[in-house]
């Protein structure tokens, strides 16, 4: 499939208005629950009752298993190794198939409609890092075929730091970042993923690697979860040229819930989240805007235990944050003061975002796209 270059127009004149910073329960939205809800990144919940409570019809489901590895510069990388991930995807597949009354293993976009019509949830298996297939670089990337056969439908090139395929967003040499490109092996991987109809995810990639991937891929690509660098100048946030390049492939950009990458203000609000969605729409067009979580369905677990006390909850991130500050990685010089937007660290977040979009002046048609139809379109274009 050829990239859909310049097929979107920038949206203009979004209606003005502020989103309420405090959102209570939303029973009024129950009658509007027919809107398709698709999330860009979440996990299989411990309690499957969370699926129905979330109102989500489908989501990219990270089934990664990781090994923590210390880097030579003292930071920690979390590698998705072949052995760990082949076990985790096998276990996830067994669990999904054993709970077919609640779950559908998403293999193509038609499974989204099947899930919605039967009050189930379609999960599309994703792995956050192509480290799991590095062992087959010299063997035609045959490990990609193994994972595809077990249900893998989206593969992220890397996670934070570069690997044999791609530069990572946090690669550094104490001078502010390396911005390493897609490698020759990375180009081969993109072609392999295109051939296997597996969605290419550039979340956590360096800007240059993301741009290279947009150029090389024959199918739409996505950043399933991320934020906007024009709003928060941080290495984990994407510059406008990356957002535009992703959109020009026919892909999309999902904005996630990690509030220290959504605002440097002391108190994170729903308005901050909506501002990122607006910016993606202005840069890439409304067809490129999507929702992502990157926490469990119920929300960030530790913050929920703390009743969303950000001052306490952020402490678990400080050691990691400070280690990257010492390496002069972009954005880590600013001390984080929060982890979540309390109103959205809730299992009802999709309804709350939908209402917030309405209050911000987004039309019903645009909300349809942002809340789920854009994901459905991209998965239809890529998966068979």
Where are these predicted regions, by residue range?
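N-terminal hydrophobic targeting/anchoring segments and the immediately downstream early-domain regions
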Residues: 4-5, 11-167, 171-176, 233-243, ...
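Active-site core of metal-dependent hydrolases
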Residues: 174-265
């Amino acid at each position: 499939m050829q990239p859909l270059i310049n097929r979107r127009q920038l949206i203009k004149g979004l209606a003005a208005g502020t989103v309420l910073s405090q959102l209570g329960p939303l029973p009024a939205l129950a009658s509007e629950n027919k809107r398709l809800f698709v999330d860009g990144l979440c996990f299989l919940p411990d309690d499957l009752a969370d699926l129905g409570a979330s109102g989500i019809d489908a989501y990219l489901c990270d089934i990664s298993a990781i090994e923590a590895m210390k880097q030579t510069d003292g930071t920690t990388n979390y590698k998705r190794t072949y052995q760990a991930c082949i076990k985790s995807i096998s276990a996830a597949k067994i669990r999904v198939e054993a709970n077919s009354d609640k779950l559908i293993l998403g293999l193509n976009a038609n499974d989204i409609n099947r899930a919605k019509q039967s009050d189930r949830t379609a999960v599309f298996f994703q792995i956050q890092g192509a480290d799991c297939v590095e062992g087959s670089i010299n063997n035609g990337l045959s490990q990609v075929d193994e994972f595809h056969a077990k249900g893998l439908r989206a593969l992220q090139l890397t996670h934070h730091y570069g690997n044999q395929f791609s530069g990572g967003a946090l690669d550094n040499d104490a001078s502010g970042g390396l911005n390493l490109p897609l490698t020759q092996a990375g180009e081969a991987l993109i072609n392999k993923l295109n051939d296997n109809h597996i969605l290419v995810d550039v979340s956590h990639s360096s800007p240059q690697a993301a741009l290279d991937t947009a150029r090389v891929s024959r199918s739409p690509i996505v950043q399933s979860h991320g934020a906007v660098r024009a709003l928060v100048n941080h290495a984990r946030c994407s510059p406008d040229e990356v957002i535009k390049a992703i959109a020009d492939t026919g892909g999309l950009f999902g904005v996630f819930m990690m509030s220290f990458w959504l605002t440097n203000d002391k108190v994170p609000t729903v308005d901050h989240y909506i501002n990122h969605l607006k910016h993606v729409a202005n840069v890439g067009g409304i067809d490129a805007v999507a929702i992502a979580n990157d926490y469990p369905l119920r929300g960030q677990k530790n913050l929920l235990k703390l009743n969303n006390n950000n001052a306490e909850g952020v402490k678990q991130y400080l050691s990691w944050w400070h280690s990257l500050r010492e390496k002069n990685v972009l954005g880590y010089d600013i001390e984080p003061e929060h982890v979540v937007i309390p109103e959205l660290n809730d299992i009802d977040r999709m309804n709350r975002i939908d209402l917030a979009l309405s209050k911000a002046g987004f039309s019903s048609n645009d909300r349809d796209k942002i809340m789920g139809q854009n994901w459905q379109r991209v998965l239809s274009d890529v998966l068979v």
